[in-house]
């Protein structure tokens, strides 16, 4: 049986005018800033806050296969299912990054009949937010180098500049570069490098800001480097926070689009969860809470990455509690964690599902540690067998875990009604949400708590560089920040080949980064890179554009 591609399904769908989508949740036309017929930005100053804000449902996942487990698909499909049940609902997602779109993932707007549209536009530039973030980031780099060239009044040590340039592309050749070459008229030579845009602190700040004033305040606190006597230098010292915030004045506004079934969707911000905090913007989530009774959102990768950061970073900053958490599981991921090779994942193997269930079990238990009841969504794939699915259901029943088979890829909202009903039962009950750790704990203890309680590790080892940074960060008064772990998404450990639910392992923190603007400390583990590279056969090889300007190959 031939299945339509995601792009074919998207192209066959009929979109409603964006003003009609806006009106369906009470957004007035004067609050709408259209970008064509089917996209718009929202002027948040013209949205009336309401007292009884909508409840937030977070969608996370078990540790994924390289292809991903359809978390965005389930997120959109669940929102469509609530829509099917006549609930007042919105979905809030991150924006896709171009680098991974051309790399391994292809597009990132959901899949099958659970997508947000217009799919081509969202995957390719969208409303220009990533361009603005890239520009603001690189403008700061230009201001830093110009300050040094013009006499260096602040005494910045060019050997200790922490701020890097960014690009929205996977480009390993740019990880380490030299700038300022070519003689005295071209600046002061120094080592530099590029990160991918989604790893930029500007991206994190945009997603954690509640207003333009908050955005400007956070930008002013960015630590760009140090003086020769190791004193931090901030954007406020350079006096360019106003200029940088000005570049972002439109990017900070949430973007309104729609699902295939007409569910309103806010798609805004896009930090990765393995190298950043992995959540869409607070402004988009809070705007949705002012407009809808239920807000379905997602956090990148598994509970060990995006969900933990959602609970310990985003929720702290935003000030709301999640009402329910959905953990997406797939039969293929369970088999992978049960020892099946990638090429054999389509073959029935109930024993491998049994062996791999330990991975899902740890993710479920992780959510419980935050005081929220999880609901498992089995995201159905065409090669799943009844025996494999029934085993997962029986495991859930034995362990008193809520579960639903979800067929939103194939059926849209109708395929997610069982999941929606399970979630409705949870959000109607009180929970006892609490973050994993108190901010007053020393940084190393916060890291140890994440490693031992969420990852299942036994010990944290700090490199000599990380130990020196811990000491320096404490002296600078940065000990009370939350921690943002940078770690592989494929394993609970820092070794991506260690699958299932390993325990007793050690995690090495090789380096720390102070994101004093965003307000967290990044702890880098293993070989994690903040500028990815492209695979041997990038998804770009299957992409093209027709003579009349339509994309081909965006999945």
From Swiss-Prot:
GO annotation terms (biological process): tetrahydrofolate interconversion
Enzyme Commission number(s): 6.3.4.3
Coiled coil start-end: none
Pathway where this protein functions: One-carbon metabolism; tetrahydrofolate interconversion
Pfam families on file: FTHFS
GO molecular function, one term: formate-tetrahydrofolate ligase activity
Record field: catalytic activity: (6S)-5,6,7,8-tetrahydrofolate + formate + ATP = (6R)-10-formyltetrahydrofolate + ADP + phosphate
Domain of life assignment: Bacteria
Keyword terms of this UniProt record: ATP-binding, Ligase, Nucleotide-binding, One-carbon metabolism
UniProt-listed PROSITE patterns: FTHFS_1, FTHFS_2
HAMAP family listed in its UniProt record: FTHFS
Family of the protein in this entry: Belongs to the formate--tetrahydrofolate ligase family.
Protein's UniProt name: Formate--tetrahydrofolate ligase
Organism of provenance: Staphylococcus aureus (strain Newman)
